[in-house]
């Protein structure tokens, strides 16, 4: 049975209302009141007038080229309001019409427009067709959010009276999707393009090749997709997918119809393992390669000393460039280790022959060769800020991701720059809430407010260099985006903040008002089936779903942006009518708290289930003649998680002095071929220094104390601990057990963790490792 999305449910409900209550007065939802445009226009004046679109309204355009814009508008109104508006070409009508025209003499930027609405109708005049399109998108946002519904709704399509003069602060407003670590279907890509267009994002940066996969068909090199698009994951399953050139053309045209330029990225000279798996001879030291199944940076890269590599690069560009009519072509250029080049006689010869003093200059040489091929196709090169190292290609545009320094340096060299620093909140794969309650992510912390606050013009950049900052871009890397819904969750609503910071004048930005307008925008996202992030209730200082206490417990909750929370204490699921959370909750007895967040549109977050348990101090044990350390037993074989331990036939027994020794310390794993699959179970005692309630945290598979399984990470991608738990403990020795399984789970090798267990006494701010002087056997 297929799961209905929240948006689909809303549409069905509104459709039923439309059928059964046509003649009844409908109350306008709070989120539809007021002006809710994102991004906020440069100038907006309200009036008391309004205009209602009805079945006699016409859409008039000044030229044939504007008819596709009118059709997009008409299609929306037909689906949501059952209005079949006629599209005509001609002068602006006197009344009951929506007029869309172009005036190249408008004193605005190319994408600017003017919009006027009053009781006679709506007039949209763009500086260009781009501007007319964005004016149409603004009109849609002046209408109720339900205009985005694919089913008829019972709401008047009323446009408030306004005069708008608008243009973007920046010409480049971008969104990058990584489809290599994980894959998105053509329909999923189009869904994101629809949302980008709605909020005036005009560049789609498509990351198509990586160590983990090659995702675009190259007819001259069929093995790039035959071999390079499929990898065998750590659990033995296969993951694959690629786009045919015909599908690429379809997506590019779909984007173009919505005034979005698609920029392809073909990574070079690093992040090339999928290509090397298909054609090993492109490496410095050919061997049998496979697409990388762990994240991070691969040491094997394209050989810069082989002429055949540059012929390959030229051939690939020759096929890819014609598929993308836009000006820019992204060649990556980031995170390219130089170890193989240093050891390669051909690379060293290339350096000597061309007077290159080091491998950084060799990378610059590589990039410049690619630039020459791109210029043949009339393309301009974009690269990540590493392309600055060793000398910048003459016409290169720099995408500054490692902070702003690269962008500042490039702008000071009179090179165009696109700002996209993770430190500025523009890496949407970063956490947007407490990592202990959010789905696993790559790390970092970029809540909505931080994203919104970013200014693409660094204070350190002289004013006369501002013109080189083309704009900013949000990047969505996909290491931990295991489903298309997870792409949605990480991207929205933060991408809307990026839309506003790149369009709206800095002086007009207002986060509180943005959040108000976001209530309306989220309903629009519902209509498109977007699984956007709803802030979860969080506990300051670190969230936990199991709270032990000895006397009383007080639980305080916040959200990463202001949201209503509701809860229950009777084990029922919280609903819209459940008790609102307004003050900290106090517990004197054991109980189960269920709490969730509610949006203005009535959508609810997942439920947090928090067990609050009153405990006596669990008694310590007498341990005769305790010795330092822990007893361990180790098994080797095809083991993936704790349930696999049942098949272990033999164990090796030993001892360790610390928890970190369980896995020999944090291991540097650069390739899955060197992984030694094993499981380690450690048992012994922990010496608790004083009576108290202690909270524990670990990335190990399991942690037990007093023969109680306190933390169970089975099934989790164990990059960060998400199952912290507490227990009331008496001073003295308590039996413990922890299990660590060495495996690759969701692309993350557990060998990259520390096998330690963290502890903190209630009231302490920070965790600390259980140290060796606390461990006994």
Curated annotation (Swiss-Prot):
Taxonomy, superkingdom: Bacteria
Signal peptide from the UniProt entry: 1-18
Catalytic activity of the protein: Hydrolysis of terminal non-reducing N-acetyl-D-hexosamine residues in N-acetyl-beta-D-hexosaminides
Residues carrying lipid (S-diacylglycerol cysteine): 19
Annotated lipid attachment (N-palmitoyl cysteine): 19
Gene Ontology process terms (BP): carbohydrate metabolic process; glycosaminoglycan metabolic process
Top-level class of the enzyme under EC nomenclature: hydrolase
Similarity remark: Belongs to the glycosyl hydrolase 20 family.
UniProt xrefs under PANTHER family: BETA-HEXOSAMINIDASE, BETA-N-ACETYLHEXOSAMINIDASE
Protein name: Beta-hexosaminidase
Organism annotation: Porphyromonas gingivalis (strain ATCC BAA-308 / W83)
Gene responsible for this protein: nahA
């Amino acid at each position: 049975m297929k799961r209905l999305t929240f948006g689909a449910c809303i549409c069905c409900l509104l459709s039923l209302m439309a059928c059964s209550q046509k003649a009844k007065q409908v109350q306008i939802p709070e989120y539809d009141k007021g002006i809710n445009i994102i991004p906020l226009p440069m100038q907006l004046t309200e009036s008391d007038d309004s205009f209602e679109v009805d079945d006699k309204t016409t859409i008039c355009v000044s030229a044939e080229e504007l008819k596709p814009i009118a059709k997009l508008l008409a299609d929306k109104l037909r689906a949501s309001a059952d209005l079949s508006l006629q599209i005509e070409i001609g002068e602006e009508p006197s009344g009951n019409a929506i007029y869309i025209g172009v005036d190249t003499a408008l004193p605005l930027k190319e994408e600017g427009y003017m919009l006027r609405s009053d009781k006679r109708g709506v007039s949209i005049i763009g500086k260009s067709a781009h501007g007319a399109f964005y004016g149409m998108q603004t009109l849609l946002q002046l209408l109720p959010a339900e205009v985005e519904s694919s089913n008829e709704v019972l709401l008047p399509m009323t446009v408030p009276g306004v005069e708008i003069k608008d243009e973007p602060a920046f010409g480049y407003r971008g969104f990058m999707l990584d489809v290599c670590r994980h894959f998105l279907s053509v329909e999923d890509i189009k869904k994101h393009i629809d949302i980008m267009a709605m909020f005036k994002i005009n560049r789609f940066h498509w990351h198509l090749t990586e160590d983990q996969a090659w995702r675009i068909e190259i007819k001259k090199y069929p093995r790039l997709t035959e071999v390079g698009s499929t990898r065998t994951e750590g659990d033995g399953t296969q993951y694959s997918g690629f786009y045919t050139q015909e599908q690429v053309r379809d997506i590019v045209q779909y984007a173009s119809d919505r005034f979005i330029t698609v920029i392809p990225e073909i990574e070079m000279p690093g992040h090339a393992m999928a290509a090397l798996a298909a054609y090993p001879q492109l490496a410095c030291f050919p061997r049998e390669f496979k697409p990388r199944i762990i994240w991070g940076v691969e040491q094997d890269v394209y050989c810069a000393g082989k002429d055949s590599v540059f012929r390959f690069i030229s051939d690939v560009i020759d096929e890819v460039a014609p598929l993308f009519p836009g000006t820019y072509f992204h060649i990556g250029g980031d995170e390219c280790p130089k170890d193989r080049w240093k050891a390669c006689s051909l690379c060293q010869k290339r350096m000597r022959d061309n007077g290159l003093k080091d491998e950084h200059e060799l990378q610059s040489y590589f990039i410049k060769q690619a630039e020459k091929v791109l210029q043949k196709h009339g393309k301009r090169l974009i690269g990540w800020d590493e392309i600055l190292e060793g000398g910048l290609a003459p016409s290169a545009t720099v995408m500054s991701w490692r902070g702003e320094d690269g962008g500042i340096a490039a702008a000071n060299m009179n090179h165009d720059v696109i700002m996209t620093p993770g430190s500025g909140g523009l890496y949407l794969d970063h956490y947007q809430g407490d990592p202990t309650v959010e789905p696993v992510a790559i790390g970092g912390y970029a809540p909505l407010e931080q994203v919104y606050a970013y200014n693409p013009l660094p204070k350190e950049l002289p004013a006369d260099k501002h013109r080189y900052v083309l704009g900013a871009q949000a990047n969505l890397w996909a290491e931990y985006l295991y489903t298309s819904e997870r792409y949605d969750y990480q991207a929205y609503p933060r991408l809307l903040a990026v839309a506003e910071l790149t369009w709206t004048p800095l002086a007009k930005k207002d986060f509180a008002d943005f959040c108000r307008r976001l209530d309306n925008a989220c309903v629009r996202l519902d209509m498109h089936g977007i699984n956007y992030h709803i802030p979860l209730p969080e506990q300051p200082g670190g969230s936990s779903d199991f709270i032990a206490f000895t006397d009383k417990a007080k639980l305080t909750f916040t959200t990463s942006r202001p949201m209503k929370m509701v809860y229950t204490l009777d084990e029922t699921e919280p609903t819209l009518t459940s008790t609102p959370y307004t003050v900290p909750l106090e517990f004197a007895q054991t109980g189960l708290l269920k709490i969730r967040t509610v949006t203005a549109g009535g959508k609810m977050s997942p439920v947090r289930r928090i067990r609050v348990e009153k405990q006596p101090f669990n008694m310590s044990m007498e341990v005769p003649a305790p010795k330092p350390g822990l007893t361990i037993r180790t098994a080797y074989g095809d083991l993936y998680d704790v349930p696999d331990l049942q098949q272990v036939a033999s164990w090796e027994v030993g001892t360790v002095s610390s928890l970190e020794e369980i896995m020999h310390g944090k291991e540097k794993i650069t390739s899955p071929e060197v992984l030694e699959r094993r499981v380690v179970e450690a048992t012994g005692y922990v010496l608790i220094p004083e009576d108290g309630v202690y909270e524990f945290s670990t990335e190990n598979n399991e942690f037990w104390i007093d023969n109680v399984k306190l933390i169970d990470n089975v099934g989790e991608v164990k990059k960060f601990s998400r199952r912290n738990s507490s227990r009331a403990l008496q001073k003295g020795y308590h039996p413990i057990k922890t299990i660590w399984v060495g495996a690759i789970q969701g692309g993350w090798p557990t060998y990259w963790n520390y096998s330690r267990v963290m502890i903190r006494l209630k009231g302490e701010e920070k965790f600390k490792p259980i140290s060796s002087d606390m461990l006994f056997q």
